Regions:
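P-loop NTP-binding core
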Residues: 1-255
Length: 255
């Protein structure tokens, strides 16, 4: 049975999409069958994997509102071992479309449960906000992976996210757990990065991955080329970091 991980942080600009793309690609590189679900209306995971968002006929939006079937949405083998449920700006209309729909929080779960046995990992890139898409993603997921940028307001975003996870656990998905925290955009030259890491460790009694994602020029360039970092520059510090994170995710004992 595939392990479903929602990559989430209600604070934008923390490396959420970067982590979704590159963790997924590195898992696929290691021979794992991966399905990536782009649940963010910005569609940056979709474009970061080399697809033109404007040309897509079927996306997560059409699936969520019942206009097409899951097999019509999944784009197989975007990379070796990696398939994609894409998104574009149309997904921003889902909130309004689903007003009054019964059990709308379970729409994604109902569909993904049909195919989870076909994959080792299903990675969901959540939007940076609390809305019906985030709730659907967390209701579907086994765990939540939390990227945290090493910056001054890191704890503020984290406290909001923990509150959301608790609400989902209480009302929709009691088995949801925190997969772990991964620090992103880390700059060892600054005292701030070091302080943020220590503050989060003090605040959160959860798994914190040993791998820390550094600030890296090649990592920042890769999305504009529609490539994950392990393909764009396989020897870069960013590629090495995400390969290490993939190893940790694979090794993490899961119940």
């Amino acid at each position: 049975m595939g392990r479903i991980i929602a990559v989430a942080n209600q604070k934008g600009g923390v490396g959420k999409t970067t982590t979704s793309i590159n963790l997924s690609s590195c898992l696929a590189e290691k021979g794992k069958k991966v399905l990536v679900i782009d649940a963010d209306p910005q569609g940056n995971t979709t474009s970061g994997l080399g697809l033109d968002k404007s040309t897509l006929k079927n996306t997560l939006y059409q699936l969520i509102i019942g206009q097409c079937k899951l097999e019509e949405v999944i784009i197989p083998n975007v990379l070796e071992n990696l398939s994609l449920v894409p998104a574009n700006i149309n997904l921003s209309g889902a909130e309004i479309e689903l007003i009054g729909i019964e059990k709308k929080e379970y729409l994604l779960k109902t569909e993904i449960d049909k195919v989870r046995d076909n994959y080792d990992f299903i990675i969901i890139d959540c939007p940076p906000s609390l809305n019906v898409l985030t709730i659907n993603s967390m209701t579907t997921a086994d765990t939540v992976l939390v990227p945290i940028q090493c910056e001054y307001y890191a704890l503020e975003g984290l406290s909001q996210l923990i509150h959301t996870i608790t609400l989902v656990q209480d009302r929709l998905n009691p088995n949801l757990e925190i997969e772990g925290v991964v620090f992103t955009m880390y700059d060892a030259r600054t005292n701030l990065s070091l302080q943020v890491v220590e503050n989060v460790k003090d605040y959160l009694n959860q798994t914190i991955y040993k791998t820390i994602i550094p600030r890296n020029v090649r990592l920042a360039e890769a999305p504009s080329h529609g490539l994950p970092i392990n393909i764009y520059d396989s020897r870069s510090a960013g590629a090495e970091a995400y390969r290490n994170l993939a190893d940790e995710v694979i090794e993490k004992e899961f119940y």
